[in-house]
Amino acid sequence: MAEKRDYYEVLEVTKTATVEEIKKAYRKKAIQYHPDKNPGDKEAEEKFKEAAEAYDVLSNPDKRSRYDQFGHAGVSGAAGNGGPFGGFGGEGMSMDDIFSMFGDIFGGRGGGFSGGFGGFSGFGGGGGGSQQRRYRGSDLRVKVKMTLKEISTGVEKKFKLKKYVPCNHCHGTGAEGDGGSETCPTCKGSGSVIRNQQTILGTMQTRTTCPTCNGEGKIIKNKCKECGGDGIVYGEEVVTVKIPAGVAEGMQLSMGGKGNAGKHNGVPGDLLILVEEEPHPDLIRDENDLIYNLLLSFPTAALGGAVEIPTIDGKVKVKIDSGTQPGKVLRLRGKGLPNVNGYGTGDLLVNISIYVPEALNKEEKSTLEKMEASDNFKPSTSVKEKIFKKFKSFFD
């Protein structure tokens, strides 16, 4: 499967582009690769879909924020459906779905340019063709709790969703039987009507949604007895979600087409998965790094030795050098979490503290008193300076 291109690159805009600039760039791409302008050209069709996918994400503030933070995984591929439109293929969005969803850009598939592009249409009012409305189902939201271990490897989670699904009795049409619906007599099935208006500049044509069928192009004569004419019923579905490694608390993934079904075989909504991170008993997360606070006994810090450190994959032995000072940080490279976009892995940082006992017996006290008298146990000027600098850094 080809790697997805950066959405900003697809539309040829900067990451600071405004919504209007993004809309203008998308319109330019859509005109360039429009199927009416490039009949039978599969490559142009794919680029047309790619531009629509990029526009869907970058024109939506929430999706754009997730994309800027997490890349494609934040809005699409993590859910295993290839994109916010399910990859624009298979069970994903069709060309008609794109025209339906971006009607404010296209003005309907049939309207638009009457010259310059031959049969090219799709951007404006006028012209003939179909502009049938497809209802979009609402999005569903679920929360998923993940351990650091699951985050480190990625995981599949199953959800049993209570949602609206297409009615089996009428196959989503909302009509009872084959003759339950008929073509709208007002718009002749196009879903829109053209109105002529006289102005000082002459006759102006405007296209509006058909008031008789509300843009559907059909009228239901006999409503389905199971769904009442909506084409959807309340049911359930088990969905398997592939969550990538490296996700973080608060990240929202999108699984295209797995939300509520749309009325009358409309476009289904999306399933939005909010990640919640379960706390680890020993490790603290700092972006892709993990932190462990190690409390050493004074003898081990002074004499050196080996201690066990917990990691995501189990415990590992770490060498402690003699004379280890409090505040020292050991770095275990590659023992952190992977980047959600696949760029490298964090480290495990071991912060060392020295344990000082609160109570001593006579023998311990006597031993420490003898040690205190030795010049070797008195901090040197360099050690004092290091401690002062470290203390001062907390306030800088």
Swiss-Prot record:
Translocase found in the keyword field: no
UniProt-annotated binding residues for Zn(2+) 1: 167, 170, 224, 227
Single GO term (MF): zinc ion binding
One GO location term (cellular component): cytoplasm
Cofactor note text: Binds 2 Zn(2+) ions per monomer.
Domain J: residue ranges: 6-71
ZnF CR-type: positions: 154-236
Gene3D superfamilies, alphabetized: DnaJ domain, Heat shock protein DnaJ, cysteine-rich domain, Urease metallochaperone UreE, N-terminal domain
CXXCXGXG motif repeat copies, ranges: 167-174, 184-191, 210-217, 224-231
NCBIfam families: DnaJ_bact, PRK10767.1, PRK14289.1
UniProt similarity note: Belongs to the DnaJ family.
Identification of the protein by name: Chaperone protein DnaJ
